[in-house]
């Protein structure tokens, strides 16, 4: 039997988090208000097992190999759910919580139609596996989706580090929502 080799973690979006968890477990990884997570907590082993078992993330709705995540009042929970989904080889679509019910329903239907409906678990992610579906604002009508694969973002991260050097590894302020 010919098994595919696992992907090089450096070619996956969550690869740097895995490395930091191993090399610098006590580094602050995510800080939100008075709450935070250290790098070691970004392993998500138990959460991943639960996600695989249920086929969805805690705040997500499974739609084939896509999972529609809705922004919650807790951005830290959304980031954890996002990481859990992409590590299972699925694609996380982040919905805008301000979408009207009918827009949300249309996005769910579109994601369901484009996803693999197989009940089998998704294979482990590869660099070419789609991991993220984002949406335009919808200012001209219905929001339009765009999909990114792991390699596209991993390459962006690599170029950022190459261009900006050590300062690219510093703290980042992300004041907006993921959607």
Question: How would you name each of these model-derived features?
Answer:
Residues 6-14, 21-29, 118-135, 165-172:
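Conserved pre-ATP/AMP-binding loop-to-beta segment of ANL
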Residues 30, 48, 67-111, 145-147:
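Short beta-strand->loop structural element characteristic of the AMP-binding/adenylate-forming
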Residues 68, 85, 136-139, 172, ...:
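Conserved S/T- and glycine-rich ATP-binding loop of Class I adenylate-forming
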Residues 70-73, 164-179:
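Conserved AMP-binding loop of ANL adenylate-forming enzymes
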